[in-house]
UniProtKB/Swiss-Prot annotation:
Main localisation: cytoplasm
Compartments (UniProt record): Cytoplasm; Nucleus; Chromosome, Telomere
GO annotation (BP), single: tRNA threonylcarbamoyladenosine metabolic process
GO cellular component: chromosome, telomeric region; cytosol; EKC/KEOPS complex; nucleus
Family recorded in the similarity comment: Belongs to the CTAG/PCC1 family.
Protein name, as recorded: EKC/KEOPS complex subunit SPAC4H3.13
Signal peptide: none
Quaternary assembly: Component of the EKC/KEOPS complex composed of at least of SPAP27G11.07c/BUD32, cgi121, gon7, pgp2 and SPAC4H3.13/PCC1; the whole complex dimerizes.
Organism encoding this protein: Schizosaccharomyces pombe (strain 972 / ATCC 24843)
Function noted in UniProt: Component of the EKC/KEOPS complex that is required for the formation of a threonylcarbamoyl group on adenosine at position 37 (t(6)A37) in tRNAs that read codons beginning with adenine. The complex is probably involved in the transfer of the threonylcarbamoyl moiety of threonylcarbamoyl-AMP (TC-AMP) to the N6 group of A37. SPAC4H3.13/PCC1 functions as a dimerization module for the complex. The EKC/KEOPS complex also promotes both telomere uncapping and telomere elongation. The complex is required for efficient recruitment of transcriptional coactivators.
């Protein structure tokens, strides 16, 4: 029987975007990607008005930091790409 890992470190990231459509686009890009260490990180993504909201539960403070840093790197790339494509 597998042992249940406790995920005591929780963080919510609420990202304001220009519109609900932009928030939904970010969600669509991020949603298919699974966490690399699913046993150590749980993620819940959803849109609230023009906000992308991401809830994380992680096994350690270090894992929380690494996970949130990765989210911000991905969001930077997604938003920059959306901006570039909107100017075409």
């Amino acid at each position: 029987m597998s042992e249940m890992i406790v995920l005591p470190h929780k963080v919510t990231v609420k990202v304001p975007l220009a519109s609900r459509v932009d928030a939904e686009r970010c969600l669509q890009v991020l949603a298919p990607d699974r966490e690399l260490k699913e046993e150590l990180v749980q993620r819940n993504l959803f849109v609230d008005d023009n906000y992308l909201v991401v809830n994380y539960s992680c096994s350690s403070a270090r894992m929380t930091r690494v996970t949130v840093n990765s989210l911000f790197e991905n969001l930077y790339l997604i938003i920059d790409t959306m901006h570039e494509l909107s100017s075409l």
